[in-house]
Amino acid sequence: MASSSTQPITTADKSILTPLMTLEGHEPYAWNNSTSDGEQEELKYISCISYFPDGKQMISGSRDKTIRRWDLRKGKEIVKDREVYNRKVLKVGVSRDGRWVVHVIAGEKGIKVSEVETGIVRTFDEDSWIDCIDISADSTLLAGASWNQVRIWNLDTGASPFKIGGYLYEALGLSEDSRKLAVRSSDSKERHLQVWDVQTQKLDVQKSTHSYLRSSHVPIFWTTKHKTIVTAFNSPDDDHYSISEFDASTLNTVGAPFKHTSQICRLALSTDCVLLASASYSTIKLWAFESRQLLASFDVESPLTLLLSPDSRQLAYTSFYDAKIRICDIPANILASIESVCIPTYIHHLHANMFILPIFFAVDLMVPLQFPATSPLPRSHIVSGTGIVPYV
C-alpha cells in the first residue's frame, strides 16, 4: 500500500500510443438533427468493451444496436456470435469464469444475463432502468443499480438477497470476497462514498462532499485483500481532476492522489494492482500504482472507454469520434519498470464497459445507462465500468 507521505512524480513526456491491432466492424449510428433542418448526422462511438477471461476474445456494444465478439488472435469479428437489438447497447460484461455475459440495452428495463454454454437468457430487475453493474470475483453474484436502489442477485438462481435505496447511484463495486459493496452516490445536497456489508445490509462507513461535479463515468475498484478502494471522489477544490485511494474501513485517503489537468473520464487498474491507467479529454496516462509515478502520457483524442488486458500487457480503448477498438502494447520499458512489484489480486473488467459522455460536457444528462464497468468484471481482468450513464 502506498505510504501516506508518497508524493506523485510527474516526469513522463507526451507521446503517441500506436495500436498493435484495430478492430473495425461497428457501424456509425445515424440520427436526425432537429436543429439542422432534419439533416442526418452520425455518432460513431462504441459504448462498452470487455475481455473474456483468457484474453483471446473481446466483446463490445455500440450505438449501432449490436453486440459483437472478436477473435483477438485473428483481429476479426466472430460474425456468427453477433447479436442485434432494437436499441443501442449501453453495457456489456463477462464473468471471470467466462460462464456469464451480461448486458444492458437502452430503452429496456433490467439486466440481460446470458449463460454462454446454453444460450439461455434471463432478465433481472425487469421494473428498473439499470445504471451500473458489477460481477463478483467468484462469478456467482451480480450487483446492479437503478436510479434509486442497489440490488445483488445470485446468477444461478436469480434470488436477490441484498437491496438498499435512497440515493442516485453513480458507481458500485464488490470486494474480492464479495462481503463488501462500495457505492458512489448523490442526493440533492451532497455526493457520497459508502461501504456496505453485503450479508447484514448495513452501512459500514460513509464519506460525503459538497462537490456537485459528478463523476458517474469513473468506476470503483477494490485493491489488494479488499482493504482499499480507488475512484474519483474529491472535494470541490479538486474539480474531480484527481483519483484517490481510500481505506475501505474508514474512507480516509491513502497516499497521494493521481492528478490530471482536466476532468477524468475513465479508469483501469491492473490485476496485480501495479499499473493504473486513466483518461481525460485528450490524454491517457499510465501510472505506477504504489509510487504514484507517472510512467507515460499519451495524446489520444476523446477516449471513451479504457481497458487493460487480463495479463496487463496491453491497453484497449475506444474514442468518441469513431467506431474502432484500438489495442496497444504497453511499452516494454514501462513493463520492465514495474516488473519487480507484484501485489496479487483480481479486479473486475466490468467497469470498462461503462458508457461515457465526452468529458467536454459540463454536466451529466442522467438517463439509463450503459454496460467502467467498471466496471468491474472478472477479477482476472481490469475493468473498465461502473457508473450512471448519461443519455445522448
What positions do the PLM features span?
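WD40-repeat beta-propeller superdomains and closely related acidic/aromatic-rich repeat-like regions
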Residues: 1-392
